[in-house]
């Protein structure tokens, strides 16, 4: 059985590595996903990243991915974010390396509960919660249901109701990544989507087909300081639609970036990370 290896273990060498492999506990890790065997699965798989000074105790950040994806897709966020924060990147049930727990029923509420279980496993009582696309919807439900565990909330291109892509492009992944995405990036995502975890994709799809966070009163229950980031030409929803749900979150603001992608956490990662870090810094200074 493959075991995830920490950055610290990788740096300290073989003796520590051997001790780690002898342990019965599978730990989160900071090394690339290829270090985890493709057939390795567990009920609550997550990756953990901390690239700052080892004597610091960083604040935790939970990164929630979207459908058809896994924790790997936060690759662009790790180098900058992990220098300031301890990153917890779960694979949602049925995706990546996470099994579907016995009796699990897909809904935003159950997915939010799953995130709490990952946090419990990681020893994290509360965290900054960040979600992209479907992960943004899960993040909003999490913040509403678990206010004491939510320090801040960042929603990066997440919908508040079922998706309806306007005038979809005939080119796979072009709507997702936008017209400026290089060919290599499009090819990578096409390869990623050619081998999806069907059970997880179907389950998340069902959960995302029957929800309305505004009508259900979820948005109004979010008390954490919230940043919503959207694109000015996203085919997932217009700026007006994003603003319509953002204003229902009591302590929130909207940032609009110039892009025709709807997966801006990937396509416009640097800009989204910059806004996120500035927001988190501002919230910290305000307390």
Q: Language-model features: where?
A:
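N-terminal export signals
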Residues: 2-3, 9-28
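Active-site loop/oxyanion-hole signature of alpha/beta-hydrolase fold enzymes
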Residues: 47-50, 79, 89-130, 274
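Conserved HGGG/HGGXW glycine-rich cap/lid loop of the alpha/beta-hydrolase fold
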Residues: 48-97
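Flexible "cap/lid" loop of the alpha/beta hydrolase fold
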Residues: 137-145, 150-178
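Hydrophobic, aromatic-rich cap/lid helix
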Residues: 189-216, 233
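Short beta-strand/loop motif that positions the catalytic acidic residue
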Residues: 222, 228-230
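Conserved alpha/beta-hydrolase "acid-adjacent" motif
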Residues: 235-241
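Catalytic active-site module of serine/aspartate enzymes centered on a nucleophile-bearing elbow/loop
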Residues: 252, 256-287
């Amino acid at each position: 059985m493959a075991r995830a290896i920490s950055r610290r273990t990788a740096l300290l060498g073989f003796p520590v590595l051997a001790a780690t492999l002898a342990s019965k506990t599978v730990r989160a890790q900071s090394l690339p996903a290829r270090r985890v065997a493709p057939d390795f699965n567990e009920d609550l798989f997550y990756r953990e990243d901390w690239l700052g000074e080892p004597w610091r105790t960083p604040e935790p950040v939970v990164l929630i991915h979207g459908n058809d994806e896994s924790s790997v897709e936060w690759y662009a966020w790790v180098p900058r974010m992990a220098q300031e924060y301890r990153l917890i990147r779960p694979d949602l049930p049925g995706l990546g390396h996470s099994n579907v727990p016995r009796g699990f029923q897909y809904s935003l509420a159950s997915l939010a509960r799953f995130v709490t279980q990952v946090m419990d496993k990681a020893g994290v009582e509360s965290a900054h919660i960040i979600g992209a696309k479907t992960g943004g919807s899960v993040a909003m439900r999490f913040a509403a249901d678990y206010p004491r565990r939510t320090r801040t909330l960042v929603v990066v291109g997440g919908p508040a109701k079922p998706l309806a892509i306007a005038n979809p492009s005939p080119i796979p992944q072009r709507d997702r990544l936008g017209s400026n995405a290089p060919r290599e990036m499009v090819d990578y995502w096409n390869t990623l989507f050619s081998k999806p975890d069907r059970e997880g994709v179907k389950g998340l799809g069902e959960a995302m087909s029957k929800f309305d966070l505004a009508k259900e009163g979820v948005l109004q229950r979010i008390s954490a300081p919230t940043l919503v980031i959207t694109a000015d030409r996203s085919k997932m929803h217009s700026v007006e639609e994003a603003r319509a749900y953002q204003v229902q979150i009591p302590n929130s603001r909207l940032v609009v970036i110039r892009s025709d992608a709807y997966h801006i956490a990937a396509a416009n990662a640097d800009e989204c990370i910059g806004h996120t870090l500035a927001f988190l810094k501002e919230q910290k200074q305000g307390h």
